[in-house]
Amino acid sequence: MEKFTKIQGIAAPMPLVNIDTDMIIPKVFLKSIQRTGFGKNLFDEMRYNRDGTEIPDFVLNKPQYRDAEILVAGDNFGCGSSREHAPWAIADFGIKCIISTSFADIFFNNSFKNGILPIVLPQEQVDILMKDAEKGANARMTVDLEAQEITTSDGEVIPFEVDAFKKHCLLNGLDDIGLTMEKAAAIDTFEAQAAQARPWV
């Protein structure tokens, strides 16, 4: 998993509330357990017409937001089913941080495991960031995980909270497999000792 330290990028505004995982990645595309390849179908039903052409008014289809790395979203983002394909699609598109007033618990935790930083802020601060994001590609927002600060294009600094363990994992690029590999030497030692103590196993 790629390390997350600091990003400075375009933020896309998506004020719609209750964006569920089926809206993020419709179930028709859940045909693979590979983490890549889902970005093209992110927000598919909002992003494309039935004939496959783009819907010009959808925020991520607008030229100024096609390379967005930050999403400023409405309340209760990621609700619905627990499919891990939702953060896979978001990460594959290139979005590394989502800011909202609240997230569904399973989506929230799955995001960290897939290199995405979900940030919870009060409504008034989300409103400030939403307004900043509406400025388009000329307004670049900075998210500094180590300092736990968001800086708007105007220089306003907004602090945020993040669980210390989840922060450690993102800063060091550790998913569940990476965390296990950190303990590889201890695991090998335990297995060797267990084999000596119980050779019949």
Curated annotation (Swiss-Prot):
Coiled coil: none annotated. One of its GO terms (molecular function) is 3-isopropylmalate dehydratase activity. Keywords: Amino-acid biosynthesis, Branched-chain amino acid biosynthesis, Leucine biosynthesis, Lyase. This is 3-isopropylmalate dehydratase small subunit. Its EC number is 4.2.1.33. CDD domains: IPMI_Swivel. The gene is leuD. Gene3D superfamilies: Aconitase, domain 4 (3.20.19.10). The keyword Amino-acid biosynthesis applies. Belongs to the LeuD family. LeuD type 1 subfamily. GO terms for cellular component: 3-isopropylmalate dehydratase complex. GO terms for biological process: L-leucine biosynthetic process. InterPro entries: 3-IsopropMal_deHydase_ssu, Aconitase/3IPM_dehydase_swvl, AconitaseA/IPMdHydase_ssu_swvl, IPMI_Swivel, LeuD. Catalyzes the isomerization between 2-isopropylmalate and 3-isopropylmalate, via the formation of 2-isopropylmaleate. Heterodimer of LeuC and LeuD. It comes from Ruegeria pomeroyi (strain ATCC 700808 / DSM 15171 / DSS-3).
